[in-house]
């Protein structure tokens, strides 16, 4: 049913675009470059580091889960009562302690990168509150994740806390990609390269992707890698959840196919949008193939972590496609014979 719906949506969008859509030409006077305290390449590199670390900690979190190391440090924020670091313990394997402790240390690195993003955004002149607000989500997200991590440990790896932990990571990955674009865009309202029906298709695909990620966490919550052997699982049939996950994937792929036809029918689409679209299709196909192999192979630990990496990669490329579909110009105020900048390049 999802595939039929996606195909019908694609046909409708393509026909509509062929009949009547054309993009208006808008002339915008750009503001003069501002004097920033830091070079642009450094700002962008900091944001890219945020993407990598946010995605990376999702993967290392999956390693903690599939190895049963979630309670390797049974207390939080200390590893053991009276000790921040692992200690010899007759009931907790040393390797599990260090896997969990290493993941907690990586949280510190993610936090430092998040703070660096905020410092860089604050250093941009003139001050851009939109950019600062977006950058602030990086360190704030780490705080939220730290609290969730503590709740997860203290509740004995309850399945819903683990699921929320992962989904918040995916939101932060998306925001980090927007932050990368923010340092090279303006603060004006977005001007879309895509007409209305095509934007609707993009919104729908993004919504289905979100549902696909949620379904994936539910499959994990009911399966063998929800945590330690004693961790309570989600009491729903794994085959039923897996089928739901697969159906959503088929629907998502159908929407991507429809989006491709619609982009071709629209014309005047930037080359970078096409490139990111093709990369997205390839990544989604690879992720889907990996999911099938993982299921048929009995859900081995290594493939589970690779599947998490694939999920983060899909989010990265989808967010990058989103940012390539619109332009944000510089804000400015026009007086007689002059243009006075109000803000320089902004967020998306």
Language-model-detected regions and their locations in the chain:
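Hydrophobic cores of alpha-helical transmembrane segments in multi-pass inner/ER membrane proteins
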Residues: 5-12, 110-116, 169-184, 248-259, ...
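N-terminal signal-anchor transmembrane alpha helix
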Residues: 44-70, 210-215
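Alpha-helical transmembrane segments of multi-pass integral membrane proteins
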Residues: 53, 140-141, 199-220
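Interfacial helix-loop-helix junctions of multi-pass membrane proteins
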Residues: 64-73, 143-166, 222-233, 288-312
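Extracytosolic (periplasmic/ER-lumenal) interhelical loops and adjacent juxtamembrane/interface segments
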Residues: 65-100
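Individual transmembrane alpha-helix segments
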Residues: 89-110, 241-245
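Membrane-interface helix-loop-helix junctions at transmembrane boundaries of multi-pass membrane enzymes
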Residues: 121-136, 261-280
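Membrane-interfacial catalytic/cofactor-binding modules of polytopic membrane enzymes
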Residues: 212-253, 257-260, 264
